[in-house]
C-alpha cells in the first residue's frame, strides 16, 4: 500500500435539467464502486422501460430511491476514484431535502461541481433570475464550499455541436456570475463535457480539439485537499443516545472538530452534564482516539439516557466546552417564503443535529446578499430573496457556535411549511454561564488524574 489517497466530499449542483444525474452517474459508473453485475441489471431495467439512453442517470435514480426509502446502501456506490483521490458524492440536488442536507449535511462538502446545460435555451433558463444555477452557487459559497469545477454539459447537443463559441459564451457569463457570488474565478476550472457520450469526462475528447484544458476527472484531481479541523476544541453533536445492557449509556454522533480519547472529561450542552469517556467505538472496533469525520459511539459513566439527547453537543470540559446559547446573531438569506417575515416569526431551525424553534427576535438590518453592506436599518419585514442580520432566541435550550469558529455548528436551515425557507450562518453567540451543572463522580475522579 502506497500513501493513502486524499478523500474529498463533493456536492453536485445546477439547474434541474442540466444533466447532473447523467454526468455523476457516468463518473461513478466508470471509476466507481458499482460492480458490472449491478450495472448490467440497471441497463436491462432501463431498456425494459424504454429508457436505454438514461442508463447513467438510472444508476443514480436507483441509488436515490433506495436512499429515500431509507435503505442504507453501500456508500461505495457513491464513490469514485482518480489516481490521486477518492471522491464521495455527498448529495445531488434531485433530493427534496437537498438544501437542508447541504446545511445540516452529513458532512461538509470540500468542493462543488456546477453542471451547466450548454444547449440553446437550456443554459439561459438555468442562469435566469428564477434558475437554480444561481441559487445553488450562492448557497454553496455561503455555506463555505469555496472550491468549484464548472462543467459545460451537453456539448453533444445539436444546437452546440461541440462548438467553441458557445463554450466561450457560457464561460464568460458564468464567470461573471460566480465572481459576484464571491468565488475566485482564477481558481475555478471550466470543462466542456458530454455526460452522456463521455467526452472529456475521463479521457480527452477528440471532438473538441480546440479545448486544451483538463478532463473533468483531472480537474477534480487538481482541487486542494481539505484541512480537517482536528486542532480545534472538540465538538461532537449527538445523533442518538442509547442504553446498552452490560455497558451503559452510549451517545452516538460524528466528531465535527477536535479529537476525543478514552479518559477525557467531557461536557454535554445544553444539558450541562459533565462526565468521563470510558471507551470509544467505531464499526464495532475500539478506538484510541476519534477525529473529525468519525461516526462513533462512546460509553459514558454515571449518566442516564434521560440526561442527554439528540441535538446535545459534547466537548472537552477543559478546552472551550460547549455552552447553551441564550441568543445568537445570524446572517439569514430568505430563499422561498410566500409572505413577509417580521419580528416574532418562530420557525424551526435545523442546526447540526438539533431541531428547535427559534424566534426572530429582532431583524437588525437588511443587507446586500453578496457584499454584506447594510441596505436598511431595522426593516419592518423581509421577504424571499432578501438577506438580513437577525437576532434569534431559541425557544428551548440549544447549543450553537459561530460559523467561523465551528462551521458545522454555525450554519442552519430554517424550516417552515415542510420546506427550507431560509438558510443562515451564525456571526455571534451569547452563551449562558455553564456553572452549576451535573458533574458525575467519574468526572471528578478523572479530573484529578
Curated annotation (Swiss-Prot):
Gene name of the record: TEF1
UniProt organism field: Trypanosoma brucei brucei
Note: The Kennedy pathway is the major route for phosphatidylethanolamine (PE) synthesis, as shown by reduced levels after using RNAi against the first two enzymes of the Kennedy pathway.
One term under GO cellular component: cytoplasm
Summary of the function given for this chain in its UniProt record: This protein promotes the GTP-dependent binding of aminoacyl-tRNA to the A-site of ribosomes during protein biosynthesis.
Similarity section: Belongs to the TRAFAC class translation factor GTPase superfamily. Classic translation factor GTPase family. EF-Tu/EF-1A subfamily.
Subcellular location: Cytoplasm
Chain segments carrying region G1: 14-21
Protein name (database record): Elongation factor 1-alpha
Region ranges (G5): 194-196
Amino acid at each position: 500500500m502506497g500513501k493513502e489517497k486524499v478523500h474529498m466530499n463533493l456536492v453536485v449542483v445546477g439547474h434541474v435539467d442540466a444533466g447532473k444525474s447523467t454526468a455523476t452517474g457516468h463518473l461513478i459508473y466508470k471509476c466507481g464502486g458499482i460492480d458490472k453485475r449491478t450495472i448490467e441489471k440497471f441497463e436491462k431495467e432501463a431498456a425494459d422501460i424504454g429508457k436505454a439512453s438514461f442508463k447513467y442517470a438510472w444508476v443514480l435514480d436507483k441509488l436515490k430511491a433506495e436512499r429515500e426509502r431509507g435503505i442504507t446502501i453501500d456508500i461505495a456506490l457513491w464513490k469514485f476514484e482518480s489516481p490521486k483521490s477518492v471522491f464521495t458524492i455527498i448529495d445531488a440536488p434531485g433530493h427534496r431535502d437537498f438544501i437542508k442536507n447541504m446545511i445540516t449535511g452529513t458532512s461538509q462538502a470540500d468542493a462543488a461541481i456546477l453542471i451547466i446545460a450548454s444547449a440553446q435555451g437550456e443554459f439561459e433558463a438555468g442562469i435566469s433570475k428564477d434558475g437554480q444555477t444561481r441559487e445553488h452557487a450562492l448557497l454553496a459559497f455561503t455555506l463555505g464550499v469555496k472550491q468549484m469545477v464548472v462543467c459545460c454539459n451537453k456539448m453533444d447537443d445539436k444546437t452546440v455541436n461541440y462548438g467553441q463559441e458557445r463554450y466561450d459564451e457560457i464561460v464568460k457569463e458564468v464567470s461573471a456570475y460566480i465572481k459576484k457570488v464571491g468565488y475566485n474565478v482564477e481558481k475555478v476550472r471550466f470543462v466542456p463535457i458530454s455526460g452522456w457520450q463521455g467526452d472529456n469526462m475521463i479521457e480527452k475528447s477528440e471532438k473538441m480539439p480546440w479545448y486544451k484544458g483538463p478532463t473533468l476527472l483531472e480537474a477534480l484531481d487538481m482541487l486542494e485537499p481539505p484541512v480537517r479541523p482536528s486542532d480545534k476544541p472538540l465538538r461532537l453533536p449527538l445523533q442518538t443516545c442509547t442504553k446498552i445492557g452490560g455497558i451503559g449509556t452510549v451517545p452516538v454522533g460524528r466528531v465535527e472538530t477536535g479529537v476525543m480519547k478514552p479518559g477525557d472529561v467531557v461536557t454535554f450542552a445544553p444539558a450541562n452534564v459533565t462526565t468521563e469517556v470510558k471507551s470509544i467505538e467505531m464499526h464495532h472496533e475500539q478506538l484510541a482516539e476519534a477525529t473529525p469525520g468519525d461516526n462513533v459511539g462512546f460509553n459514558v459513566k454515571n449518566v442516564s439516557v434521560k440526561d442527554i439527547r439528540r441535538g446535545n453537543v459534547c466537548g472537552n470540559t477543559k478546552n472551550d466546552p460547549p455552552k447553551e446559547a441564550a441568543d445568537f446573531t445570524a446572517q439569514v438569506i430568505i430563499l422561498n417564503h410566500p409572505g413577509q417575515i417580521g419580528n416574532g416569526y418562530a420557525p424551526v431551525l435545523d442546526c447540526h443535529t438539533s431541531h428547535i424553534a427559534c424566534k426572530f427576535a429582532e431583524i437588525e438590518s437588511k443587507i446586500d446578499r453578496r457584499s454584506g453592506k447594510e441596505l436598511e436599518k431595522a426593516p419592518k419585514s423581509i421577504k424571499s430573496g432578501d438577506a438580513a442580520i437577525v437576532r434569534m432566541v431559541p425557544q428551548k435550550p440549544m447549543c450553537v457556535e459561530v460559523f467561523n469558529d465551528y462551521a458545522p455548528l454555525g450554519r442552519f436551515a430554517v424550516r417552515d411549511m415542510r420546506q427550507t425557507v431560509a438558510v443562515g450562518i451564525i456571526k455571534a453567540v451569547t452563551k449562558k454561564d455553564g456553572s452549576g451543572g451535573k458533574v458525575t463522580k467519574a468526572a471528578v475522579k478523572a479530573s484529578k488524574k
